[in-house]
């Protein structure tokens, strides 16, 4: 057991999907995994382990934001030995050629969070996806006929921001905004693990188009299928 996860040793697979929403974790377990059992209910942050195409896979809710995902990634790696971590979440598009429901593979993540500035003493660090996962996810998406977007995302510390300045990030090619990827990639690098974020565009910051809360919780299956297939293909 760790502070925030009550699983016993061996109950969590070495490959795990990380949705922010614990109810999405439950949806993934019930919809895609065989024989799924719940190993964590602490703070309502549900975690499950089952099998996908015969491969053992876990799925763990992380909550929203850098501090929350950092807690779960640290404990999953240090207390349970997880090797491969794939975030499956939502993001807001800031490019005109990115549409609601598009799937984005986050190659890298810019951020306004001070986590890395504190870690690296004021210097910049470039949080980056693991190449094997990124390449495999792209190949899986192409096989499924998806129009994937691959590029930089922006990990924001604030959801409600009075001075967001998305225009600057968009001008430099950032595809979308979310709240966790920079932390995931940094911690994976620190501990020598593999990490990737597979994101579905849930809303468009430029146009105002958005999906419903129910859709965010129980749809977006293409993203989940890409993540699961990627997890079982990469050793």
Curated annotation (Swiss-Prot):
Keywords from the UniProt entry: Glycosyltransferase, Transferase
GO cellular component: cytosol
Molecular-function GO terms, alphabetical: purine-nucleoside phosphorylase activity
Ligand binding (phosphate): 20, 24, 43, 87-90
Cited function: Catalyzes the reversible phosphorolytic breakdown of the N-glycosidic bond in the beta-(deoxy)ribonucleoside molecules, with the formation of the corresponding free purine bases and pentose-1-phosphate.
NCBIfam families, per database record: deoD (TIGR00107), PRK05819.1 (NF004489)
Name of the molecule in the record: Purine nucleoside phosphorylase DeoD-type
